[in-house]
């Protein structure tokens, strides 16, 4: 789960991480009142969406007068902000953060993420913070330092000093940097975050360290013990299809292709998408119906897939272990009739009650294309899309 920058900064304040004074605003009038309350003389008007790259996309503006605050708030609120993380359609800006300007002497990058490979938390930091960190990571990976933190030990002073010296924090500011790093790690640990990213973390002219941005991801499996974080959830920032799928215990992620996928098991779902790509197609979604699929769940899965107007064909790929093929077949037939399916449908089934499942599909009278292997299924669904062009 993601939250907005201003919400992340509320969390950081609770953990004694220095951040600029700021006030969220949901209208132009609120933005002006927020600026008046902060006092100025310089303010930053920041779009609040669940995506990075806002500055490059025109979603962050420096205002030096109330007129400019009003002007930029009017321009940004309601805009469809496009960044490298939003996709070509962008995201609508429904809220702003009005913040005091900062005396920036140096920008750093700092983040904490979970590293499953080492089963540790890893701090990644760089002396090259700011809007171009992605380019830095790609072209100069040596400028990104990593410090692995054993969760049984926690972040030590030695770890903090390695990070601070590695990114070039001045000697006089290292004690404060050490405190900030420790408090950031405590924020990450105590909130069950899977990512805390501060970009930029700044050195001010007075030598103080401050978090100028705040990006959080939280482990959804731990949200049950963090109602205060769940309260930050902004449904408007989430994919409507993914929200609908979660109501039926379906694991669904929207993609940019035109071939809908309905599969049981996350591993098989990913392999199915890879195979579609291998044979020249583009998957429109990841969809795992799990091991307890019913006719209702399959029907809802079809409805969710077909709400995406880009879907030109559907591939159902089922391995009958816990899930019986005849149950899925019944669900597919019911779903096709319920949604009045008009796009080509390819079904591949293997496993428990496979023959019975195939018979149910064959006897349905529906124009279902059958396949015996994953390669054959992918070939047929790609061909079906091409035929309908």
From Swiss-Prot:
- Please name the Gene3D superfamilies in this protein's record: ATP-grasp fold, A domain, ATP-grasp fold, B domain, Succinyl-CoA synthetase domains
Annotated keywords: ATP-binding, Ligase, Magnesium, Metal-binding, Nucleotide-binding, Tricarboxylic acid cycle
Named cofactor requirement(s): Mg(2+)
The residues covered by the ATP-grasp domain are: 9-244
Question: Any keyword Cytoplasm?
Answer: no
Q: Where does Mg(2+) bind?
A: 199, 213
Instruction: List GO molecular-function terms, semicolon-separated.
Output: ATP binding; magnesium ion binding; succinate-CoA ligase (ADP-forming) activity; succinate-CoA ligase (GDP-forming) activity
User: Which InterPro entries does UniProt cross-reference here?
Assistant: ATP-grasp, ATP-grasp_succ-CoA_synth-type, ATP_grasp_subdomain_1, Succ-CoA_synthase_bsu_CS, SUCC_ACL_C, Succ_CoA_ligase-like_bsu, Succinyl-CoA_synth-like
Q: Tell me the Gene Ontology biological-process terms attached to this UniProt entry.
A: succinyl-CoA metabolic process; tricarboxylic acid cycle
Which PROSITE patterns does the annotation name?
ATP_GRASP (PS50975), SUCCINYL_COA_LIG_3 (PS01217)
> EC annotation?
6.2.1.5
Binding of ATP occurs at 46, 53-55, 99, 102, 107
Q: Which residues bind substrate?
A: 264, 321-323
- Pathway assigned to this chain's UniProt record: Carbohydrate metabolism; tricarboxylic acid cycle; succinate from succinyl-CoA (ligase route): step 1/1
> Gene Ontology cellular component?
cytosol; succinate-CoA ligase complex
Q: What class of enzyme is it?
A: ligase
Cofactor notes? Binds 1 Mg(2+) ion per subunit.
- What does this gene product do? Succinyl-CoA synthetase functions in the citric acid cycle (TCA), coupling the hydrolysis of succinyl-CoA to the synthesis of either ATP or GTP and thus represents the only step of substrate-level phosphorylation in the TCA. The beta subunit provides nucleotide specificity of the enzyme and binds the substrate succinate, while the binding sites for coenzyme A and phosphate are found in the alpha subunit.
Please give the subunit comment from the record.
Heterotetramer of two alpha and two beta subunits.
Homology family: Belongs to the succinate/malate CoA ligase beta subunit family.
PANTHER family recorded: SUCCINATE--COA LIGASE [GDP-FORMING] SUBUNIT BETA, MITOCHONDRIAL (PTHR11815:SF10), SUCCINYL-COA SYNTHETASE BETA CHAIN (PTHR11815)
How is this protein named in the record?
Answer: Succinate--CoA ligase [ADP-forming] subunit beta
The record's gene field reads sucC
């Amino acid at each position: 789960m993601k939250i907005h920058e201003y919400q992340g900064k509320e969390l950081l304040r609770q953990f004694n991480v220095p951040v600029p004074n700021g006030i969220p605003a949901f209208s132009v009038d609120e933005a002006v009142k927020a600026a008046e309350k902060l006092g100025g003389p310089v303010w930053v008007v920041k779009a609040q969406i669940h995506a990075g790259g806002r500055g490059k996309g025109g979603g962050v503006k420096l205002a030096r007068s109330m007129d400019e605050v009003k002007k930029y708030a009017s321009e940004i609120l309601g805009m469809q902000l496009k960044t490298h993380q939003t996709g070509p359609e962008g995201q609508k800006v429904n809220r702003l953060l009005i913040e005091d300007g900062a005396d920036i002497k140096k920008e750093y990058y700092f983040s904490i993420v979970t590293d499953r490979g080492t089963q540790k938390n890893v701090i990644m930091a760089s002396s090259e913070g700011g809007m171009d960190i992605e380019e830095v990571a790609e072209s100069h990976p040596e400028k990104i330092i990593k410090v692995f933190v054993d969760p049984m030990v926690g972040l030590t002073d030695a770890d903090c000093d390695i990070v601070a010296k590695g990114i070039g924090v001045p000697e006089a500011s290292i004690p404060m940097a050490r405190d900030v790093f420790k408090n950031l790690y405590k924020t990450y640990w105590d909130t069950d975050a899977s990512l805390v990213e501060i970009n930029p973390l700044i050195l001010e002219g007075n030598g103080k360290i401050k978090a100028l941005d705040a990006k959080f991801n939280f482990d959804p499996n731990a949200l049950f013990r963090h109602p205060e974080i769940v309260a930050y959830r902004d449904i408007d920032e989430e994919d409507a299809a993914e929200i609908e799928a979660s109501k039926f215990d379906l694991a669904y992620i929207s993609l940019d292709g035109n071939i809908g996928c309905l599969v049981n098991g996350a591993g098989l779902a990913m392999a199915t998408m890879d195979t579609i790509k291998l044979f020249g197609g583009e998957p429109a979604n990841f969809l795992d119906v799990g091991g307890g699929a019913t006719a209702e769940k399959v029907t809802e899965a079809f409805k969710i897939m077909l709400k995406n107007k880009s879907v030109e064909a559907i591939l159902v790929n089922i391995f009958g272990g816990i899930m019986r093929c005849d149950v899925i077949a019944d669900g597919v037939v019911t779903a096709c009739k319920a949604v009045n399916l008009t796009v080509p449908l390819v079904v591949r089934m293997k496993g428990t009650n496979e023959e019975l499942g195939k018979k149910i599909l064959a006897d349905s009278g529906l124009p279902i294309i059958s396949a015996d292997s994953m390669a054959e299924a992918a070939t047929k669904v790609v061909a079906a899309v091409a035929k309908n062009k």
